Regions:
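N-terminal chloroplast transit peptides
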Residues: 1-6
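Small-polar-interrupted transmembrane alpha-helices in polytopic inner-membrane proteins
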Residues: 108-130, 204-224
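N-terminal transmembrane-helix/juxtamembrane module of multi-pass inner/ER membrane proteins
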Residues: 8-87, 125-138
Length: 267
């Protein structure tokens, strides 16, 4: 139909949080340096131990056993790792319908990065074999914090990798339903315009909001691990840095794929 306001084909939209929005090489370098610094300190004279011990003693002196166990260890520690895994899973299920090469790539990279990050945490824990602050936990080691890394990776993947395709799919679904409803009462042209207006008006959360929530998720989880007497401060710093590394690698990898899709004209 001539005069349609919806273009028949559009180039795949680049990932919203690429190197133009976040300086990924700088962020990756900073996170790598932080992790390497903490790891080196643990393997040498561990000068950061004074800070770790001071924070640990402060937590024990200012909180009760019940607060540490019921609130910090159970709620704060698990809120974002469990919530992030749920968000990643639900996003994947939602996107399974009408998969495009770009969406397939994002899903594959997201799950691959998450699994790889958890495998890396397991290997690093065994390699560093750092005792936990609580003498009651002897079955696993402390560095790096797996919960903090998981919260960082899962939240980052959901916000920066899958949120945009989920948002686009939801817009199309709502727009289609609205168009069908309008077309049953009005002429098709007006329904088409309404659908386009809806898709233009709807915008996903801005980058600043995503970054703020990403930081909040990591800090909340780290606080839970420290106050729950599960980890030293440096454990959570290492876990957060490791999570940032994996999220940055995921974004950079996806960007390379989507650049190739654009150049090849693949939707």
């Amino acid at each position: 139909r001539s005069g349609s306001v919806v273009s028949p084909r559009s180039a795949p939209r680049r990932i919203s949080c690429d190197a133009k929005d976040i300086n990924l090489p700088v962020l990756l370098s900073a996170a790598t340096f932080e992790f390497a610094f903490i790891a080196f300190d643990l393997q040498t004279d561990h000068r950061f131990s004074a800070v770790d011990t001071a924070i640990h003693d402060l937590v024990l002196a200012s909180t009760s056993d019940q607060l540490r166990e019921d609130v910090a260890a159970q709620v704060l520690s698990n809120l974002f790792p469990i919530g992030g895994f749920g968000a990643l899973t639900l996003s994947t299920l939602f996107l399974l319908f009408g998969l495009t090469p770009s969406v397939k790539t994002r899903l594959g990279v997201a799950w691959g990065v998450y699994i790889s990050s958890m495998a890396a945490v397991g290997v690093l824990k065994e390699a560093f074999a750092r005792p936990r602050p609580s003498a009651d936990i002897l079955h696993s080691f402390a560095f790096p914090s797996g919960h903090t890394c998981a919260a960082n990776v899962l939240t980052g993947l959901t916000l920066f990798v899958l949120l945009d395709p989920v948002w686009d799919a939801a817009k199309k679904l709502v727009g289609k339903n609205k168009a069908e409803y309008k077309s049953s009462q009005d002429e098709l042209g007006r329904a088409d315009v309404k659908t386009q207006d809806l898709q233009v008006a709807a915008r996903p959360p801005i980058l600043g909001m995503r970054i703020s929530f990403w930081i909040f998720a990591s800090c909340t989880t780290a606080t839970g691990r420290i106050e729950g007497n599960r980890h030293w401060l440096s454990d959570t710093m290492g876990g957060a840095a490791l999570g940032i590394i994996f999220v940055c690698l995921a974004l950079m990898l996806i960007q390379q794929f989507e650049d190739a899709f654009v150049s090849d004209g693949i939707d």
